[in-house]
């Protein structure tokens, strides 16, 4: 089976590498390029014609939505998945109108991304299964493209800043590192409550694991460690 050529458009190196690491868990996908600017994305789109683009909206030299408009105007035959912190309904509505396959709001739950990639793989496989389609086949295609009711929720906790959240995850790049809400609060210069909110979001998104530790005086304390190995920012 041919691989699904994939272009990642993300200006944060660490986030781009996390996406690459996640995509590598699916053998049917092949990352053929990473663009950190709109201009570079346009060039790679023209050069590679990837079958899938994972796209951020906020780029140093423009908006990802402009790349979608450009793709539509040039009759791009692949599909686009928006992965962005942009939660404005105006952007979401236009992205839907322009035909994006899915729209994921950062910080993204790993299982949510996994579900989207699996759906896209099934969608593409179904498209290639025959030259002519029955109504049943058409119904299946549209059901695959639409999000199933069993899809996991991806709404982040309130008060989560994306850049701070990614900084917290980076602290756990070494799998031997553990933190508590107290130790993280000192690093972030925040309250213990705020630090715990980020740690619990990491657990919710399957990036971190939490355990109960009983200290020297027997008082239980919640400690956190990395569930995945994150690449160092370059």
Swiss-Prot record:
Residues 181-200 bind DNA. The keyword DNA-binding applies. This is Transcriptional regulatory protein CitB. PANTHER family: TRANSCRIPTIONAL REGULATORY PROTEIN DCUR-RELATED, TRANSCRIPTIONAL REGULATORY PROTEIN DPIA. The keyword RNA-binding does not apply. Phosphorylated by CitA. Member of the two-component regulatory system CitA/CitB essential for expression of citrate-specific fermentation genes. Phosphorylated CitB binds to two sites in the citS-citC intergenic region where it probably activates transcription of both genes. Keywords: Activator, Cytoplasm, DNA-binding, Phosphoprotein, Transcription, Transcription regulation, Two-component regulatory system. The modification 4-aspartylphosphate is found at residue 56. InterPro entries: 2C-system_Tx_regulators, CheY-like_superfamily, DpiA-like_HTH, Sig_transdc_resp-reg_cit/mal, Sig_transdc_resp-reg_receiver. In vitro CitB and the CitA kinase domain form a complex, formation of which is enhanced by ATP. It comes from Klebsiella pneumoniae. It comes from the Bacteria.
């Amino acid at each position: 089976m041919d691989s699904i050529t994939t272009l990642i458009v993300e200006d944060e190196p660490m986030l781009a590498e996390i996406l690459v690491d996640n995509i590598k868990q699916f053998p049917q996908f092949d990352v053929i390029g990473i663009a950190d600017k709109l201009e570079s994305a346009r060039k790679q789109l023209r050069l590679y014609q990837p079958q899938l683009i994972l796209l951020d909206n906020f780029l140093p030299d423009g908006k990802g939505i402009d790349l979608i408009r450009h793709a539509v105007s040039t009759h791009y035959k692949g599909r686009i998945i928006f992965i962005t912190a942009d939660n404005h309904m105006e952007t979401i509505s236009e992205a839907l109108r322009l035909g994006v396959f899915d729209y994921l709001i950062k910080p993204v739950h790993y299982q949510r991304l996994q579900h989207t990639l699996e759906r896209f793989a099934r969608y593409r496989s179904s498209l290639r299964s025959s030259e002519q389609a029955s109504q049943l086949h058409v119904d299946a295609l549209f059901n695959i493209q639409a999000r199933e009711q069993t899809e996991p929720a991806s709404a982040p906790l309130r008060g989560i800043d994306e850049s701070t959240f990614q900084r917290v995850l980076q602290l756990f790049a070494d799998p031997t590192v553990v933190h508590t809400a107290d130790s993280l609060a000192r690093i972030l210069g925040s309250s213990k409550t705020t630090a715990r909110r980020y740690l619990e979001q990491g657990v919710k998104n399957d990036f971190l694991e939490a355990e109960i530790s009983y200290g020297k005086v027997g008082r239980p304390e919640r400690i956190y460690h990395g569930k995945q190995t994150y690449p160092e920012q370059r």
